[in-house]
Amino acid sequence: MIVSSSLFIGLMSGTSLDGVDGVLVDFSQEKPNIARVASSKFAPDFIEHLTALQKPGNNELHRAALAANALARVYAQVVHALLAGSGVSAREIRAIGAHG
């Protein structure tokens, strides 16, 4: 039996290049309930890598792909923190939305 969950995770890394913020929200009631928040700061070398992508250079596509993979790992860290801190399992999450 598949149970429809009302738990969602939102992730965002903004233009400030400082890190990723995440939220676990329960939409089961009339008013959404923020169940947990978590964030992770970017390492200084990752910030330098992202900043360098704003200028023309060698291997831009390769460097952008490496940055995307590193960003995905930070997203995963924040999701893990949200789940661990709330006692919610990954199977209980209906969807994850990410922007950044």
Where are the model-predicted features located?
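Short acidic/glycine-rich loops and adjacent helix/strand connectors
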Residues: 1-100
